[in-house]
């Protein structure tokens, strides 16, 4: 989701359209035959269980798929085999991925004003991806609570050096409850990503951040952090919403001391793969409609909504077309991206190989925001793309997915390079009230996926993919 942060800030100002026309043939866009086929595709996807069954296997059976892990390698082999069973042309594209391994992660408050004699208090903490380790015995230091980067700067080295900084920037729960969880995430994620480097600049010995997520169940949300050249690397972790509140309150009473132990390791990069599978087009086989999701995940849970659901919905598209014995006019290319979570090396490898072939990428679709009820789809590229969606929205009307939102900042991290190169890009459009309650934390488990709703996601992705593959004219770009 790294390249989606700008888009997250723009989501509230996107242009959303609802379409009301009936599904009649528009020969310059979609033939009556294509529209009839799209209705069949939607019905098969919405009523089927393929995406649900595949997401269940990836998340509950294979489990967390951290880049470089045995589980990620197993998932690559599994998905490739499913595509071969469908008769697709399958390619494993080599990708060198980070190999960061989580270790011990504990934290305790050891001193605070008014504490009972001999008391300690456990803090829910998780290491952030790519963090360096504390000593094996941990570190103990006073905590300095800051609400934002400006407050950190005002305090300066005199008040920060030798201490552990808690960035207590609050995730915007009101924005999340209004359905704009991605925008709330976009506001807070900078503290997770850049907090350690900012604190180290003033001599901090470690940084902890209030989780960039909407859980209120005392769960810490992990995610990627980054260091900066020329600034010391210090350990970095995230604490739960509730623990951040407690520490911030205790800090108003007097000094607070914390003992922090984080022992992750960064091992040498390791070889992995994107899974690429083509369902050849009948008329324009050298033009591609990408349909995709990412196969890797974080390691605190099963990576169910992030992103077993998305990748399963994506590769349900060729399964549905095979079931209905439909062949698209353009090639539908499924991609299971590797390493979205830790830097996007899979996306970068694909774009590097295909840079000279960008004009033949007709459209790109990415599913990576959960598996709740979709209300339509988002698109990026030329604003004029909006005129192409009326018939598709009407096909999706029976399941209430008629909205199309223009999001110029982009709609997906892994297809981001294609979007920036001018390829029209699409993603399912969700109400984001619940996604960030489970995002990157220990509750991202298969029970969060509803059988009916992932079928609806599959339907949106399949209708978009087949509609773009059979469009009668080029898209503006």
Language-model segment annotations:
Residues 22-30, 34, 56, 60-177:
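Noncatalytic luminal/extracellular "stalk/propeptide" segments of secretory-pathway proteins
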Residues 29-69, 104, 219-224, 296, ...:
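N-terminal capping segment at the start of a domain
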Residues 36-37, 111-112, 124-157, 225-304, ...:
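Soluble metallo-hydrolase cores and metallopeptidase-like ectodomains found primarily
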Residues 38-46, 60-70, 141-146, 155, ...:
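Second-shell loop/turn segments in exported
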Residues 46, 84, 114, 136, ...:
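Metal-dependent peptidase/peptidase-like ectodomains
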Residues 53, 319-345:
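Short helix-loop-beta-strand segments that form the rim/entrance of peptidase-like active sites
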Residues 69, 120-235, 302, 403-404:
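Extracellular/luminal Protease-associated
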Residues 319, 323, 436-477:
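His/Asp/Glu-rich mid-to-C-terminal helical/loop segments that flank catalytic regions of hydrolases
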